[in-house]
Amino acid sequence: MARQQGLRKALAEKFDDELKFFKGWIDKPKAVGSIVPTSSIAARRMASVVNPDSGLPVLEVGPGTGVVTRAILARGVKPENLYLVEYSEDFVRHLRAQFPGVNVIHGNAFDLDATLGDKRGMVFDSVVSGVPLLNFPVSQRIAYIEDLLNRIPPGRPIMQLTYGPLSPVPAGRGDYKVEHFDFVLRNIPPTQLWVYRRPVAS
């Protein structure tokens, strides 16, 4: 009986997350890239690049309802060492309720100095991004990735998901390397994962 109740609760929470995500997509389709949250399988792959033992905090941009956030915490990152930047006020309220202790910041991912405020000079271990970059001009995508790379050590990754077949940030347009990380079929829609890094000086 307890197991059935637990299953019903888990299904209800998943359905609630999907409703929140769909509402966010209806309200702000440019800021929300899909009508359903990222799958737990894609979330674990995205979180796999995070190094919880680096001693540095982790930045997640565009966390939505927190599926990837949960995977990052499961990697061993302490809540106080995880910073989330989310544009939707509804998602911000949800994230603060779901993840007490995590630093949830409401603001624009394309203006991180203003959004991070007194944390603008913080150096992060890595960045996990769910921002729907294909909804923005290429020049803005490049500037976004370059800005994030300025906030992590050389060689450390930015993990970015996208629903298009190609990297949303083209190679050869800035001081970064592009790596195709994975294609996750078990996601709606199927998603491509890309990694961006600054080369380590030899």
Question: What would you call each of these model-derived segments?
Answer:
Residues 91-118:
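S-adenosyl-L-methionine
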Residues 142-154:
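A short glycine-rich, Lys/Arg-flanked "PGG" loop and its adjoining helix->strand segment in the class I
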Residues 65-77:
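Conserved SAM-binding loop of SAM-dependent methyltransferases across substrates and taxa
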Residues 88:
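Conserved SAM/SAH-binding beta-strand->alpha-helix loop
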Residues 55-64:
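Conserved class I S-adenosyl-L-methionine
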Residues 183-202:
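Core SAM-dependent methyltransferase catalytic element
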Residues 14-52:
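Class I SAM-dependent methyltransferase Rossmann-like catalytic core
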